[in-house]
């Protein structure tokens, strides 16, 4: 929703999501291609803003933008990013490698991106009723940033490499913990047990879930975009 999603952030996020896919295989992204289809309702300055975000992400993660295409669209905006990465053959990590008695480990804070979206949607509704209102997003800064400007976990890949750790199976969380763990189980032909009391729940998650009357575990399991 471009009402609250700046095009610069959209370009940045589109790249980072694809870099994250490479990280999820224990690899490092080196190159990307970007193809954009855009309608005539977008000004040239809007495309500049979009590519500012794309280039910022490339600079942040030391990734080369090596090609792509720009064409017209009958309506709306379409962005397609392809990422190319490298990983040692012995360290490549697939969804299908999980073994019996493996420990399921989650990195980072789950559920914040979804709550950031809920906050932005709420403030949009307030704005539609009163266009003169100015939202105070400072108390929700981390959550909103998780939605608008996520970061790929290249730090985790570096940590694993530094400590000579190669996971048996790995995936990034796009659609919530429950969806992704099912992907791992199905690909590896294994089952798993998750303990809700062992899943980390950030204080900001608990606070905003209480504000929105949401169940923290449901947000973590089904929120996505973490």
List each model region and its residues.
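Helix-biased detector of long, well-ordered alpha-helical tracts
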Residues: 1-226
């Amino acid at each position: 929703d471009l009402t609250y999603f700046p095009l610069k952030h959209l370009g940045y996020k589109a790249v980072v999501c694809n870099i994250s896919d490479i990280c999820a295989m224990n690899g490092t992204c080196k190159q990307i291609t970007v193809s954009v289809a855009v309608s005539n309702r977008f000004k040239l300055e809007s495309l500049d803003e979009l590519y500012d975000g794309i280039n910022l992400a490339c600079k942040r993660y030391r990734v080369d933008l090596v090609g792509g295409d720009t064409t017209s669209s009958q309506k709306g905006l379409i962005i397609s990013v392809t990422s190319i990465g490298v990983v040692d053959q012995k360290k490549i990590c697939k969804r299908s490698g999980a073994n019996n008695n493996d420990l399921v480990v989650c990195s980072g804070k789950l559920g914040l991106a979804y709550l950031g979206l809920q906050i932005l949607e709420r403030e949009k509704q307030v704005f539609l009723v009163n266009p003169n209102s100015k939202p105070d997003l400072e108390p929700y800064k981390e959550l909103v940033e998780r939605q608008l400007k996520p970061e790929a976990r290249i730090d985790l890949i570096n940590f694993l490499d530094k400590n000579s750790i190669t996971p048996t199976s790995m995936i990034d969380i796009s659609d919530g913990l429950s969806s992704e763990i099912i992907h791992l189980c199905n690909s590896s032909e294994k089952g798993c047990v998750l303990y809700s009391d062992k899943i980390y729940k950030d204080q900001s998650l608990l606070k905003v879930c209480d504000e929105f009357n949401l169940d923290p575990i449901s947000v973590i399991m089904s929120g996505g975009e973490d």
